[in-house]
Amino acid sequence: MRKAIFSFLFSILTVLAFAQGRQIEIRSSELVKGFQASGFARIIRPVFVHEGSTLASDSADFNQTANTFEAFGHVVITQPSGTVIYSDHLNYDGNTKLAVLTNKVKLIDGDATLTTDHLTYNMTTKIGTYTGGGKIVNGKNVLTSKNGYYFETSRDSYFRYDVVLTSPDALIKTDTLRYNSTTKIAYFYGPTNIYGKDDTLYTENGTYN
């Protein structure tokens, strides 16, 4: 069951990965250190616009020909949906619409906040993935795992390996879990221990609200 779920996830993550994107535009900047024949420029305080999203940072190396840029310092991605992503560093490809964010990454989607040190975010599918540890805080619920997949559209999160869900009423440990930030319901797909205030429960398939 778990293999089928994550095979499905990876197939979704690759959808449109190589679709040709529109050209990245510069909305504003403090300084542009000349475009060379290669189309490369160093930009200070840039605000980029790409297919409805704005991407800002302290500085960026922009390759207009390749339709990519590398951004440094106080990176902020704001999407039309209202979701905002912060980080210290960003590599963005306008052709695939893939954003690779590193160092102090924070994704805020309404009342759900995801933090990690490395996040790959697909601006087309609106799916974010981490494989080096991450945390999602949703109200009073806190979820941590080694690997995580956040689906902005459905607000579903899939967690894999060393998964821990901490809620006011219980501590849950498992290796595979799905959680919805709107309903706050957790779904288990493998060996799971639920430690309540008065008892402990073991299960391999079920839900927790």
Language-model features: locations:
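Bacterial Sec-dependent N-terminal signal peptides
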Residues: 1-24
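N-terminal amphipathic/hydrophobic interface segments
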Residues: 20-209
